[in-house]
């Protein structure tokens, strides 16, 4: 299934919102943005620079949403989004990163989702602590790449969708030479584990027709060495953000206004609202709509999947592991495989981050933080029996956190082709942002950013048209004329330490 590209308005008319305000008795158009993740902040910044009155309502006691840089280790550790996918000027976040002088640690120089992502420097071990020969890892990786290529034939042969796991099973039946035995089979399961981590869901739920439809920007993948927090703070600067404001209801009125109700009884009124909460929150119906959203919209929301990935960060007094970017453990099933991101190589701090996705992530959320950290240490001690206990640890729970109820969206098996157009379509003066509505760059920070910009532009157009001044006004876009995206003379700072 081909995913349709996001569209941005062109042929923009001349004029400014200030000129309109003068003609409308200085009535300043107002917009409420629900959610202060990077998508909501991008939407709010865009509208603010267009002279709209913007209020951001955030349920948490912090901004950033699924971007969260923790400093309790004495160094920045991103417990949510941590990569810039597309280390190049193609990335819309590049101007901000460049202007702030932030460093990117490139973990992969290619644009692949699976084949080489994060694997330029790695160490794999079996469950008994034996290191897997790099030649075997490379050989199985090549086989895995071919297996995925063969699934394209399966996809072309059938009109019905199926899971990636089903497609792989058919490929192996047809091509027995691609089957792996013994330790090679366990390495293959590790590659499958890495694929499941990318989508934050098990392979038996990933759509074969859609899994490789995302568009990758050039430049490979880079870790934010100083964390994403500086980027978030820059976009949020001087915006009217109300923390601890959990939205419970959105009401469309007969006079083209919206009333947004907040837990505790406070109401906010505006000309329009942009909703950028995670898709998991929308799927759980934690925000009521009055009148109810139309069926075409609710079915789009319910028809998209939401995955789960959690991080368990461990700080040690010293680094005792090899100087590689990733430490991985192979096993007979992808569920039992695991891997650690080595922040010591990228930042110099003795920190390992265990990453669990899909069913494993959900199961770990059933444990206490201490029990989760103990489980992760058991995995680490299979590789390094003499590993000391961590000095500190951090555990995320994105799947059960009521502010997220999941990590990011994925395409379910049999998803309707018109789901994405319906998902991003506004309902009167209710607009939708967030990473889930970005067809091309779903699940990424820059994808969420672009979705917020797009929603704000659509919102501007709606208000201008309602006021009868569309032909006299131009949209303001962060993509072209914002101070925070002002082109700097220095290049992106890319480190390989």
UniProtKB/Swiss-Prot annotation:
<dbReference type="Pfam" id="PF01593">
    <property type="entry name" value="Amino_oxidase"/>
</dbReference>
<comment type="function">
    <text>Flavoenzyme involved in polyamine back-conversion. Catalyzes the oxidation of the secondary amino group of polyamines, such as spermine and spermidine. Substrate preference is spermine &gt; spermidine. No activity detected when putrescine or N(1)-acetylspermine are used as substrates. Plays an important role in the regulation of polyamine intracellular concentration.</text>
</comment>
<protein>
    <recommendedName>
        <fullName>Probable polyamine oxidase 4</fullName>
        <ecNumber>1.5.3.16</ecNumber>
    </recommendedName>
</protein>
<feature type="binding site">
    <location>
        <position position="66"/>
    </location>
    <ligand>
        <name>FAD</name>
    </ligand>
</feature>
<feature type="binding site">
    <location>
        <position position="435"/>
    </location>
    <ligand>
        <name>FAD</name>
    </ligand>
</feature>
<dbReference type="GO" id="GO:0052901">
    <property type="term" value="F:spermine oxidase activity"/>
</dbReference>
<dbReference type="GO" id="GO:0046208">
    <property type="term" value="P:spermine catabolic process"/>
</dbReference>
<keyword id="KW-0576">Peroxisome</keyword>
<comment type="pathway">
    <text>Amine and polyamine degradation; spermidine degradation.</text>
</comment>
<comment type="similarity">
    <text>Belongs to the flavin monoamine oxidase family.</text>
</comment>
<dbReference type="InterPro" id="IPR036188">
    <property type="entry name" value="FAD/NAD-bd_sf"/>
</dbReference>
<feature type="binding site">
    <location>
        <position position="247"/>
    </location>
    <ligand>
        <name>FAD</name>
    </ligand>
</feature>
<keyword id="KW-0274">FAD</keyword>
<feature type="binding site">
    <location>
        <position position="58"/>
    </location>
    <ligand>
        <name>FAD</name>
    </ligand>
</feature>
<keyword id="KW-0560">Oxidoreductase</keyword>
<keyword id="KW-0285">Flavoprotein</keyword>
<dbReference type="InterPro" id="IPR001613">
    <property type="entry name" value="Flavin_amine_oxidase"/>
</dbReference>
<feature type="short sequence motif" description="Microbody targeting signal">
    <location>
        <begin position="495"/>
        <end position="497"/>
    </location>
</feature>
<dbReference type="InterPro" id="IPR050281">
    <property type="entry name" value="Flavin_monoamine_oxidase"/>
</dbReference>
<dbReference type="GO" id="GO:0006598">
    <property type="term" value="P:polyamine catabolic process"/>
</dbReference>
<comment type="pathway">
    <text>Amine and polyamine degradation; spermine degradation.</text>
</comment>
<dbReference type="GO" id="GO:0005777">
    <property type="term" value="C:peroxisome"/>
</dbReference>
<dbReference type="GO" id="GO:0046203">
    <property type="term" value="P:spermidine catabolic process"/>
</dbReference>
<dbReference type="GO" id="GO:0046592">
    <property type="term" value="F:polyamine oxidase activity"/>
</dbReference>
<dbReference type="InterPro" id="IPR002937">
    <property type="entry name" value="Amino_oxidase"/>
</dbReference>
